[in-house]
Design a protein with these regions (language model features):
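Metallo-beta-lactamase
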Residues: 17-111, 115, 126, 152-203, 218-224, 248-264
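Active-site neighborhood of phospho(di)ester-bond hydrolases with catalytic His/Asp-centered motifs
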Residues: 97-100, 125-135, 154-156, 189, ...
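Cap/insert and terminal regions of metallo-dependent hydrolase folds
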Residues: 218-281
Length: 281
């Protein structure tokens, strides 16, 4: 019940940001959400892959800027429904991944989800990374070797610079190991670049220095823009302790939520409540 309430609050908040006169007309092709799969108007399929086992609640202590009164008013005293998620994309005959989760050695379930769909790591042609935290790049390696033998990897140049060239060595061991393993297949982009399959990389910095959102047709993959959608959809000014720069994260959240509302975009987020999609109305 708590999860349903939280998702309803999130969807209502996004819908409230738009006016009826700006809604898509009946003649326009619209995306279709069916369970854990979103089909875009251009035929691209986006499939949610659950990476965490069981249910996931973010503790209210993750959001110290939120008052106890606000948490109580939203009915979130038990925690804020969330997930650890990745997303598959099937476009132009290729299977692609947005982020790779925790990794099987840390309890990640991504590979199990792929197996259920009849896919293996060799099926993946491209991996797009929203940022370099361990629950997003943890699935890149298996037994210290690249898991995705045929995949090209796309990552923010800003994120790469911050983690690989500027971060103290005691904080970037996993990041260096992953980037070195894929160095010959790594493509660094700038914000605003159009990548393969028409995906546009958008500035979503704050959670990490180069945190990226990806826009594809009616979809916006928002990474870790929100860790508690039921709270942050209505109060984007509230950041979580996971955000490396809380002020920048709040600015990005407000800007991107407004952008998604104005363009009627579905959002897919790595910590949104299951099944990790938020509709635009």
């Amino acid at each position: 019940m708590l999860r349903k309430l939280s998702l309803l609050l999130a969807c209502t908040a996004l819908a409230a940001c738009t006016s009826d006169k700006s809604a898509p007309s009946a003649e326009q092709a619209v995306p279709e959400l069916n369970g854990n799969q979103l089909t875009l108007s251009d035929g691209t399929s986006i499939v949610w892959l659950k990476d965490n086992a069981g249910d996931r609640l973010m503790p209210r202590t993750l959001f110290p800027e939120a008052s106890d009164l606000l948490i109580s008013e939203l009915g979130l005293q038990e925690g804020i429904p969330a997930s650890v998620s990745t997303f598959l994309m099937h476009a132009d005959g290729e299977w692609c991944l947005f982020d790779t989760g925790l990794g099987a050695s840390h309890g990640g379930q991504m590979l199990s989800g792929m197996t259920e769909l009849g896919l293996t790591p060799d099926s993946i042609s491209i991996v797009y990374l929203t940022h370099f935290h361990g629950d997003h790049i943890g699935g890149m390696l298996q037994d210290d070797q690249p898991l995705f033998a045929h995949a090209q990897v796309y990552a923010s140049a800003v994120e790469y610079q911050a983690w690989i060239n500027e971060m103290p060595a005691e904080r970037n061991g996993q990041q260096r190991q992953v980037m070195e393993a894929y160095q010959d297949r790594l493509h660094l982009f700038q914000f605003g670049d159009t990548l393969t399959h028409g995906i546009v990389a958008l500035d979503a910095v704050g959670h990490t220095p180069g945190h990226t959102a990806f826009e594809k047709a009616e979809l916006l993959v928002i990474g870790d823009l929100m860790h508690g959608a039921a709270l942050q959809m209505q109060h984007p000014e509230i950041s979580g302790n996971y955000d490396m720069d809380k002020a920048k994260a709040a600015e990005s959240r407000e800007r991107i939520l407004k952008y998604a509302a104005e363009k009627h975009l579905f959002m897919a987020g790595m910590h949104l409540p299951e099944p990790a999609f938020i509709a635009n109305n």
